[in-house]
């Protein structure tokens, strides 16, 4: 309902010429906009239609997230793994889905209001990070995250133009180059993450 106090917890836009507000695409395929007949508007979902994106520009949304995080911190958890953290600063009207201009402002605020004064590990998932971007997250002086994990090494065996489940033999020299680059670039500004795969990728041993 447009009258719900939670309406602005999500991202809604009016149709344009009877269709989607713009051409943003879902990571699962198709449009990132889903039409809601009851309200006559579209809501944004970069993943499943059952996972509408939160409106991080709404300070009440951010405070709700921080309250949930502090609940678990008080329970004694050891840290947080933040899925696609680079997308919380999205600006859909400008066709920006990742690395938006307020991204690091939000993460710094999160740090100050939740885990910043605790001995916790925080790791953010970033599909588009370069070493320089990674340091924006993990530089201790910036008070954001402990580290990120990125996917440059894990995508070396992918075949251009084919789904990620189709792979080619891994270039070992290329792998060494990527791992060395990240290890060197983050030497004094954060931790590098070493992993082969996750639930979004084919198994390296298959």
Protein language model annotation of sequence segments:
Residues 1-206:
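Active-site and adjacent substrate-binding regions of carbohydrate-active enzymes
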């Amino acid at each position: 309902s447009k009258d719900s106090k939670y309406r602005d917890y999500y991202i809604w836009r009016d149709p344009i010429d009877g269709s989607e507000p713009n051409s943003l695409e879902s990571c699962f395929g198709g449009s990132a906009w889903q039409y809601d007949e009851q309200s006559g508007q579209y809501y944004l979902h970069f993943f499943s239609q059952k996972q509408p994106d939160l409106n991080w520009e709404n300070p009440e949304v951010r405070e709700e997230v921080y309250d949930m995080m502090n609940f678990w911190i008080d329970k004694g958890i050891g840290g947080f793994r933040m899925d696609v953290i680079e997308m919380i600063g999205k600006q859909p009207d400008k066709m920006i889905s990742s690395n938006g201009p307020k991204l690091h402002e939000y993460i710094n605020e999160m740090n100050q209001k939740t885990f910043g004064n605790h001995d916790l590990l925080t790791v953010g998932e970033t599909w588009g990070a370069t070493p320089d971007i990674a340091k924006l997250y993990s530089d201790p002086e910036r008070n954001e995250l402990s580290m990120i994990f990125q996917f440059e090494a894990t995508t070396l065996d992918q075949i251009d133009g084919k789904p990620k489940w189709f792979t080619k033999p891994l270039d070992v020299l290329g792998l060494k180059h990527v791992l060395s680059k990240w290890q060197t670039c983050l030497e004094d500004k954060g931790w590098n993450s070493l992993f082969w795969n996750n639930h979004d990728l084919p198994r390296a041993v298959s």
